């Protein structure tokens, strides 16, 4: 960890008691700040508050009192998910108080090598692939952190100048990271997402590009080259641009040509040997290859990871095979694009379980994918009527309404036959029925296990 004095004697408010918020509060206290930690909920575990106060940190729980904006804080470290138009945050914005996220704090104290991944889809898989590739044969520590469920500031505090962190960075985190500068930045893709938070597509894109805002020509931006829109984004960086392309639209970085994956003019491996299924995972593999090669990773390590890595939980996760039916959990599919790419990964007939929080959009874009891949559609949640309408437009012969992703499992089994894929890929957020996509996916897996009498195979 870097020894910095920027926070000594400063008054800092930490908003949000999540994993990253609590770690940020403790780190700031160690750095000499006077810290107040606030959460609108009262923690279920009383030890959370007791531990904070035992460390000399003031805890304010049960609300976000506007009076905090009048207490002379020098800095706010905000949970990324709290919108800037929330009354308390808006009050600090109006006063001109600097507001950062824990991603920025972690960056400020990290002394080692930083690789960072963002994008609308594929972030977690790509982050994990890169971490495993760079770690293989590396004598120093290599960890992942960030939006992947591990506090960046905590890991940064523990690691030294020869170590590497691969972060997954969300648009929410990047908005509050004004000096963030990874040596290697990766943008997997950019679609319209989180418009309830960012308000406009352009705001969302601008937030994502925060990953390369401070890079120089000595740094690298690895970016998907398969859409003209994404190619244009590369003009907005000072970094050295390294493209990756499943469609071979560039051969300057990592790309697929024919049945093989290449790094520049060097063949790495056959695409069919990548264990992860679907074209989106070829793209994730290419992005990881580029970042790994720029980090000096040997081809043997890259091939070993790509031929053994079976996936990240809830991201097109293979669950089990029972009586000729294969079950997949893609609960992380919270937008239309993710379900599009999931369906493209299967040649077998798909019984699709889809639906969830209604964010106000329709699913007409899914119609051609339904038409080509979906044998039966089981819909649930707030958006079920819109999802059903898309299925009807596609000519899906069997459409069934269910309560949620759990009750849909026996319905899917009833409609299936040997050779079918039963896929949970909701194309919607989970918050209408579940606390998050992880819980939704876990409940789906439990329902599959109960139905089949088997345990998941990963």
Curated annotation (Swiss-Prot):
NCBIfam families: murD. GO terms for cellular component: cytoplasm. Cell wall formation. Catalyzes the addition of glutamate to the nucleotide precursor UDP-N-acetylmuramoyl-L-alanine (UMA). GO terms for molecular function: ATP binding; UDP-N-acetylmuramoylalanine-D-glutamate ligase activity. Its EC number is 6.3.2.9. It is found in: Cytoplasm. Belongs to the MurCDEF family. It holds the Pfam family Mur_ligase_C. The gene is murD. One of its GO terms (biological process) is cell wall organization. The keyword Cytoplasm applies. Keywords: ATP-binding, Cell cycle, Cell division, Cell shape, Cell wall biogenesis/degradation, Cytoplasm, Ligase, Nucleotide-binding, Peptidoglycan synthesis. ATP binds at residues 119-125. This is UDP-N-acetylmuramoylalanine--D-glutamate ligase. It catalyses: UDP-N-acetyl-alpha-D-muramoyl-L-alanine + D-glutamate + ATP = UDP-N-acetyl-alpha-D-muramoyl-L-alanyl-D-glutamate + ADP + phosphate + H(+).
């Amino acid at each position: 960890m870097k020894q910095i004095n920027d926070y000594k004697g400063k008054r800092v408010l930490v908003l949000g008691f999540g994993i990253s918020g609590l770690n940020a509060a403790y780190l700031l206290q160690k750095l000499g700040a006077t810290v107040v930690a606030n959460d609108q909920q009262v923690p279920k575990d009383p030890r959370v508050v007791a531990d904070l106060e035992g460390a000399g940190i003031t805890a304010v729980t049960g609300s976000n009192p506007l009076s905090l904006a009048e207490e002379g804080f020098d800095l706010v470290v905000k949970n990324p998910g709290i919108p800037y138009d929330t009354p308390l945050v808006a009050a600090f914005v109006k006063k001109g108080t600097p507001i950062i996220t824990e991603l920025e704090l972690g960056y400020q104290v990290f002394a080692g090598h930083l690789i960072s991944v963002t994008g609308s889809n594929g972030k977690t898989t790509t982050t994990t692939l890169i971490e495993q590739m760079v770690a293989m044969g590396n004598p120093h520590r290599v960890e992942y952190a960030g939006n992947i469920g591990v506090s960046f500031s905590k890991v940064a505090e523990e690691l030294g100048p020869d170590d590497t962190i691969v972060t997954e960075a969300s648009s929410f985190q990047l908005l509050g990271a004004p000096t963030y500068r990874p040596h290697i930045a990766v943008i997997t893709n950019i679609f319209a997402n989180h418009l309830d938070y960012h308000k406009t597509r352009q705001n969302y894109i601008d937030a994502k590009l925060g990953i390369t805002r401070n890079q120089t020509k000595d740094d690298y931006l690895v970016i998907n080259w398969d859409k003209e829109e994404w190619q244009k984004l590369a003009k907005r960086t000072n970094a050295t641009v390294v493209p990756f392309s499943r469609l071979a639209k560039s051969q300057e970085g990592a790309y697929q040509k024919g049945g093989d994956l290449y790094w520049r003019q060097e063949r790495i491996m056959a695409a069919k040997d990548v264990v992860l299924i679907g074209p989106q995972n070829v793209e994730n593999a290419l992005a990881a290859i580029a970042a790994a090669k720029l980090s000096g990773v040997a081809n043997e390590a890259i091939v070993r990871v790509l031929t053994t890595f079976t996936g990240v939980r809830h991201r097109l996760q293979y669950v089990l095979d029972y009586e000729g039916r294969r079950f997949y959990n893609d609960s992380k599919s919270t937008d239309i694009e993710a379900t599009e790419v999931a369906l493209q990964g299967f040649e077998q007939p798909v019984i699709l379980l889809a639906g969830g929080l209604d964010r106000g959009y329709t699913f007409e874009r899914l119609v051609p994918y339904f038409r080509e891949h979906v044998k039966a559609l089981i819909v649930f949640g707030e958006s079920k009527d819109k999802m059903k309408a898309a299925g009807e437009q596609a000519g899906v012969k069997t459409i069934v309404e269910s309560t949620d992703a759990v009750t849909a499992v026996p319905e899917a089994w009833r409609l299936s036959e040997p050779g079918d894929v039963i896929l949970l890929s909701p194309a919607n957020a989970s918050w209408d029925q579940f606390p998050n996509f992880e819980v939704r996916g876990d409940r789906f897996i439990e329902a599959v296990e109960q139905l089949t009498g088997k345990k998941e195979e990963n």
